[in-house]
Amino acid sequence: MGRVLQKKKNRSSTPKQKPKRTGQLKSGKKKINVLGNAIIAQNWDRKLTLTQNYRRLGLVHKLNAPTGGSEKRPTKDGRIEELPEDPLHIRGSAKASAKQAAMGETRVERDPETGKIIRVIRDEEEIEIGGRKVKPSNPLNDPLNELSEDEAAQQPASQRANAKSAIVQQLERQADQEGQAVKAKKPRHQSKREEEWIMRLIERHGENYSAMARDRKLNPMQQSEGDLKRRIRKWKANHSS
């Protein structure tokens, strides 16, 4: 029999105290270690916010377009610095995308039966190449071609300075070195015992891989037929010369 007090606790509606979840925020989202990189940790200013630190380092803390609350800094002549919107930002809603649409007149092509708009005809869409109508300024339909070439000149000096800061260059060099290290990684070599095991399988079953996979004595770990094929193919390649 259990104690009466313990039974009352089990029936109580008072929530039990849950163990503290390390690495998780109050909102339930996973806590991200922004100082996981040694270069960023060395240049991180704890007095600044995450957005301010990333802007100072020349990085971006999110790809989505800002929806408000961004900091507007005054320039030397007393005006407010207007940060131009990055055209590569991900739009969060259709309303935000509609605000970017230029107002004007254009021609449309409608379906003669339903009256629905099939396509919008603009002045620069009159060129036809290979049976397809393309823009004269973008015959290959490159989505990045529509970005302004003078975009860098329109940005403020503070943003242009951070575009290729020394920290960004260090991070790029680090990423390049890690990529080269992965490419130069030596492949796994089969051990002597693995080669002896493969030889015993071939001596007993020949090229019958399905029988090898079903063999409980020689294949106690129940390696699959495809895995055995890959191991034997690698063994043959090493012993062919």
Swiss-Prot record:
Question: Which domain of life does the protein's organism represent?
Answer: Eukaryota
Query: Keyword set for this entry?
Result: Nucleus, Ribonucleoprotein, Ribosome biogenesis, rRNA processing
- UniProt entry tagged with the keyword Ribonucleoprotein: yes
Gene Ontology, cellular component aspect: nucleolus; preribosome, large subunit precursor
Q: What does this protein do?
A: Involved in the biogenesis of the 60S ribosomal subunit.
Task: Please describe the quaternary structure of this protein.
Answer: Component of the pre-66S ribosomal particle.
Q: What is this protein called?
A: Nucleolar protein 16
